[in-house]
């Protein structure tokens, strides 16, 4: 009978697949993590042994902030590469959705390392906006306000704008337009308004119903025209600067992303033709992680694309649509929390 080897364990658990460059098994058969670019391996068995010597017993949560840093750098470098390849003339803004992990050490680490990449934050409620305002982001970093909005949430966002924060309030329901107009008039602020568009395209995987036409949030085509008319009537035509779409989380199939991007690019073009100088497109979340290492669209825990492929599609789609219609390239925002 063949003796079981460490390589057999690596193959059985597909560690080389899902571990990417971060996790692996060393020659002792122990799991290790390589959180930094210097390739220093940290033996997790040694870490646990040391914790027990300090009277810390399992279960414990080990956090590797360097992996967060590396993911930010990876996404930024992918956009830089795509911009060079497709002659993209806009800017890319990485925005972290604070709902993913609101723990102070995590948010502070992301903001601290993300400063050189102009990383911003996304909030989906008034309490989250309070937390975001308290974080010391760069002055030109973007804050995106999504989710259910009442008068107090909107007024807080506009007050933060008066303080110098770069805030976009995204309209997701028709009634929010009146609230924004009233608050803007009361506070004497010209708001930066975004509109969430409910695309016909949807994502794939476990959370596909959180986006696309089945989504609870966003405006359909007919509602979009009504919203634009209302904004014009309230004197806010020039305040409409962003369109936002979200087709779901952990999207497993790159083809679904490509379809949604083409649909969103068409909205971008048509809005420019209607005289709206949209200069930001928020592609929402959905960038998936290959948790099981199979690189397959048939598993809800995997994806059939890389970060670079995702970014290439985002950049190329809007560059192509913009160039064909002789309009400026939009600045692209991504809200990936994974």
Model-derived segments and spans:
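Low-complexity, highly charged intrinsically disordered N-terminal segments
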Residues: 25-102
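Active-site loop ensemble at the mouth of alpha/beta enzyme cores that anchors a bound cofactor
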Residues: 208-211, 297-309, 315, 338
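N-terminal and secondary-structure boundary signal
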Residues: 254, 297, 321-328, 333-338
């Amino acid at each position: 009978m063949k003796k079981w080897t460490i390589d057999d364990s690596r193959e059985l658990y597909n560690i080389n697949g899902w571990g990417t460059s971060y996790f692996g098994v060393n020659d002792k058969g122990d799991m290790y993590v390589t959180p930094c670019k210097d390739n220093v391996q940290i033996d997790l068995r040694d870490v646990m042994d040391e914790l027990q010597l300090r009277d810390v017993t399992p279960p414990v949560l080990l956090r590797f902030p360097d992996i967060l840093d590396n993911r930010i750098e990876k996404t930024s470098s992918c956009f830089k590469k795509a911009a060079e390849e497709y002659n993209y003339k806009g800017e890319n803004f990485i925005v972290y959705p604070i709902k993913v992990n609101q723990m102070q050490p995590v948010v502070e680490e992301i903001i601290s390392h993300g400063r050189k990449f102009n990383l911003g934050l996304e909030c989906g409620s008034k309490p989250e906006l309070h937390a975001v305002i308290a974080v010391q982001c760069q002055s030109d970093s973007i804050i995106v306000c999504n989710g259910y909005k009442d008068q107090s949430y909107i007024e807080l966002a506009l007050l933060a704008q008066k303080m110098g924060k770069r805030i976009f309030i995204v309209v997701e329901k028709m009634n929010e337009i009146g609230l924004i107009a009233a608050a803007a008039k009361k506070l004497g602020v010209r708001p930066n308004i975004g509109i969430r568009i409910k695309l016909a395209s949807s994502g794939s995987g476990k959370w596909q119903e959180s986006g696309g036409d089945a989504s609870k949030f966003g405006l359909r085509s007919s509602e979009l025209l009504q919203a634009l008319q209302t904004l014009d009537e309230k004197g806010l035509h020039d305040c409409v600067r962003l369109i936002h779409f979200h087709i779901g989380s952990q999207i497993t199939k790159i083809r679904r992303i490509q379809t949604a991007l083409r649909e969103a690019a068409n909205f971008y073009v048509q809005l420019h033709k209607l005289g709206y100088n949209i200069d930001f497109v928020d592609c929402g979340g959905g960038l998936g992680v290959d948790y099981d290492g199979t690189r397959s669209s048939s598993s809800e825990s995997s994806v059939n694309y890389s970060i670079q492929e995702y970014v290439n599609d985002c950049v190329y789609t809007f560059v192509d649509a913009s160039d064909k219609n002789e309009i400026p390239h939009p600045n692209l925002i991504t809200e990936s929390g994974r």
